[in-house]
């Protein structure tokens, strides 16, 4: 937890705040700027939207920290939930997620949002404190021309309070301590894993290193943000190995997901790589673009990003419940080992295994990318309409831009990308998308509702 160690005097407002690292939150230059601003604004220059600004900073910080897509769903929810409760706590328009409104009436909402985002990011990425503090000082300095120093300081204090409360709340969500390594059925019986069961998959090319233990098993039992339990929307089991549907999907993977000699077009190969990045960050960039185009206010953005990112976090938890309930094998295992000897090809390698990340190190069903994307798409369609057009870039295929005429177009392409990458069966993607949408629908009806709106029911 962050505690006050150093006192700053901003005019007549005493404000205590220093990070645990020892780096002061407000630099001397910023303090001077606030004091010069005086009791009234001196310029009518609207500062940048602090929500969009710090969503961008969050995205950059997550990438710089090398955070994997699963853990990133928790990161973006922590940041957005803190920002929302900080903003909403000053002028309540919605039900709070966790922190009840108790801010001074004169506190700056913008300063509260900035501080809340900063606190969470420094808690999560202490190695980036210097960079984040520079962003903080720039953001707060931009407020000095339009808001009173006392209002800014009160907003910062409230933002800190909210972020500390959200941080303490989620420290007990089950993220730590990590459970023992999960190696599939082998870890339980000490023998060869059963047909159809996940086991560690080869990692890295050209030499296909031994597999690693399953990633994030604690997410399968993590306390959700809004859902009543991880299994609330648990999917039915994956396709039976002796079903014609499974045979069709296995054949599709064998032909379309292989690294060499596949039936893919160049565009299909590209889109598999394009969507191999961090799911939560794709959708935060999409939401930022649409928000800017539609002219949402920063308070509307605080609500939108909290709703989307909390939905994605709960979708990830629901997805991991399914992964570690069914423990279904990855295509590389299914094709190399085979349901029968006639089905097997021990030389088969997925297309994405030629790139960093490759086959994800956790059970196959359902698809995490599709589940989280389904949640985001549902939330954004409710805000902007299903047929909102947008473009998106990718950290895994720099310089490329893909365009979409609807959210369904995007989630359909994401499903194709996982199949063409050779890492998911199609049913896993289709059902994962449905799971994510179910989670987001529930979150939208049971959390962050407008004041006086009970969500029209308590059903699950």
Tell me the role of every PLM-derived stretch:
Residues 29, 459-460:
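RTX-like calcium-binding, glycine/aspartate-rich low-complexity repeat tracts
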Residues 26-38:
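Bacterial N-terminal signal peptides
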Residues 11, 22, 38, 455-457:
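Residue-identity detector for glycine
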Residues 40-44:
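Sec/Tat signal peptide C-region and signal peptidase I cleavage site
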